[in-house]
Structure formats: structure tokens, C-alpha cells
Regions:
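A charged, well-structured terminal subsegment
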Residues: 108-113, 181-217, 221
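Short, flexible loop/turn segments with low-complexity composition
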Residues: 221-236
């Protein structure tokens, strides 16, 4: 269901993606969208989301697209290694992110996209959560830095349900029965006071903590439960999916 008419030109990549992916999502999911109208109709913005499945960029794109925006993701650079996929992702305006060494390039591209008026989607956790109960874990600073530098609104988005469609690092989707995918868009995170200060590591950390707290609050509302007081930290507790990823 289109809630808000798209104002941007889709281009061939988005037209192809929407034509193939949206019917599949409608056939395999039941969406429960909350407060999607908070996504700005125009202008640069950052949507900061929790990450629970390799499929959740598609389910997230569904709500963004149907509220009249084309999502621009910070996508893992490895996805651009295939020539055909690279052509598709580039045409769709997606932004490659190197895991090591060239993060500044992706950051600059994301800042420029927001300044051009794009809707940029960021997963502050940087990868699928490793929390045993799938709560948002500790995060990286990208969403905070983009929001602080551009002055654009950073909206927290909590999501739940995509992990039932495709569990983390599983190769087998569970398509039947249809899975309920719930997404809740929060009010913009309060960052104006931090924007008045020098962009120091401490200021960026405070902004990152606020964004993660706001995302977690949305997930708590969806799940009707309270997140742990302390976030899962892979640097301390390790990666329980390490063996599964290498298999």
C-alpha cells in the first residue's frame, strides 16, 4: 500500500527492484508499520535502524518506498565485487562501505547524499546483532557523525520479524506461513545541543548513545519487553556467529 506518492525519479535499478522484490515481500510478509509518516516527505534525512536479518534491508526499503522516498544504504563493499550487482547497486544510488581502511570515503559519500536531499539508511550496529535475544547491541558512529555534520534529522527505526523470515546467517528462508514484519519510526533524535559543540569523540559518542537508545526504545515498544540494561558488545563477549559465517 502506497501511503505517500514518490516524488523522485526511480531510474531503471529501482524500477527493476520494486517490480521483483515488492511482490515477493507482499507474498511472504504481513507488514505492520507504525508512524511511517514521520519519515520526511522531502529533504535529507538519516534513518538509523537495528539489524536482525540479511533480509531486513529489503523489508526496510518497503516502508521507506511506500512513504515516498528512495532509500540509499551504506552497503558492504563486498556486494560491489560482482560486476552485475555493482552496476545495479550503483544505479540505485547505494554507497559502498569498506570494512577496513576506507570508511572515510563512504562517510563523505553519505554526507554528500544527505546534503543532496537523499534519505540515507544506516545500521549503527554495523552488522546483524549478536545479542542472544536480538536486542540492539553496541554501535558505530556513522549515523551520529552524519547527523551532526549535516544537521539533518536522524530518525530511529525499530524493526522486528524479518529474522523469522531469514534467521541470522541462515541460508534457508522460512516463507510459509507469511511472517509479520513490524517497523516503528520514532521522532528525530535530539542532537541540536551537540551540534553546537566541537565534533570531538566524546560528542560523537553521546550522539551515538542517544541514537541507539532511541532505536532500542522503538524495539521495546514493538516487542512489549524491556531490553537488557547493558548492551551486547562483541569486543567483550565475542562473536557467536563466527563459525556459522565461515561454514
Amino acid at each position: 500500500m502506497t501511503v505517500r506518492k514518490l516524488q523522485q525519479r526511480r531510474g531503471w535499478a529501482f524500477s527493476l527492484g520494486v517490480g521483483i522484490i515488492k511482490p515477493l515481500l507482499l507474498a511472504t510478509t504481513v507488514h505492520d508499520w507504525r508512524h511511517g509518516e514521520r519519515i520526511p516527505a522531502t529533504g535529507g534525512c538519516v534513518l538509523a535502524m537495528n539489524h536482525i536479518s540479511h533480509l531486513d534491508p529489503l523489508t526496510a526499503a518497503h516502508i521507506v518506498y511506500d512513504h515516498g522516498r528512495l532509500p540509499r544504504y551504506l552497503a558492504k563493499a563486498g556486494l560491489f565485487e560482482n560486476a552485475l550487482l555493482r552496476r545495479f547497486l550503483t544505479a540505485a544510488g547505494q554507497i559502498p562501505v569498506e570494512r577496513e581502511g576506507r570508511g572515510a570515503v563512504a562517510y563523505a559519500a553519505a554526507v554528500e547524499a544527505v546534503r543532496r536531499g537523499e534519505c540515507v539508511v544506516v545500521y549503527p550496529e554495523g552488522t546483524i546483532t549478536r545479542d542472544p535475544d536480538m536486542w540492539p547491541m553496541t554501535g558505530k558512529s556513522g549515523a551520529a557523525r552524519i547527523g551532526l555534520e549535516t544537521g539533518a534529522p536522524v530518525l530511529p527505526v525499530g524493526q522486528w520479524g524479518a529474522q523469522q523470515l531469514l534467521p541470522p546467517y541462515s541460508k534457508k528462508p522460512h516463507l510459509i506461513p507469511r511472517k509479520r514484519v513490524t517497523m516503528s519510526v520514532g521522532e528525530p533524535v535530539a542532537l541540536d545541543d551537540l551540534r553546537q559543540r566541537e565534533l570531538t569523540p566524546e560528542v560523537v559518542k553521546q550522539a551515538t548513545d542517544r541514537i541507539l537508545a532511541a532505536i532500542t526504545a522503538q524495539v521495546e515498544e514493538i516487542r512489549g519487553a524491556q531490553a537488557p540494561a547493558e548492551r551486547y558488545d562483541m569486543r567483550v563477549s565475542g562473536d557467536p556467529y563466527k563459525d556459522r559465517k565461515s561454514a
